[in-house]
Amino acid sequence: EALKGDDQLAISEAVVRNFIADYFTWTNKDGNYEVGGLQYIYGPMFTSFQEQSRWEFYKDLDFYISQYGRENLLEVSDITITSSAVAGNFELYSGEEFASFYIETTWNYKPSPKIDVDSFQKTGYFTVINNNGRYEIAQFFDHYD
């Protein structure tokens, strides 16, 4: 729906929703090597983000699959945009600047009989950039200080 118009904020919100649905859902993953949502990450950060994810959020995925079965793992059930705004230019480490959008979100997981889904991340603070018409996540955090 967002892509039918040219509302950059709505497009950025859609990117974040799709990222959350793929990255934080484990029921469709075969192992910790299969990091979801990478297509929404700023291109030059792709490899480092994938590696960091495998050592952090995905580090125990293989164990969870073998102990509890993939069907009993995390599956995002709903996503709420709690705040969004045009954020001005965002400067990357390379010195490049891009138009950016700030998105705050919360989400929930389907209940699981095997794991405590409430012990996993359920909030995110995202910066989305317009990289020559391609909307990409340049950074995100699980808490805001």
Model-based region annotation:
Residues 26, 30, 34-37, 49-53, ...:
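Generic local-structure boundary detector
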Residues 82-145:
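Exposed beta-sheet edge and beta->alpha loop/turn motif
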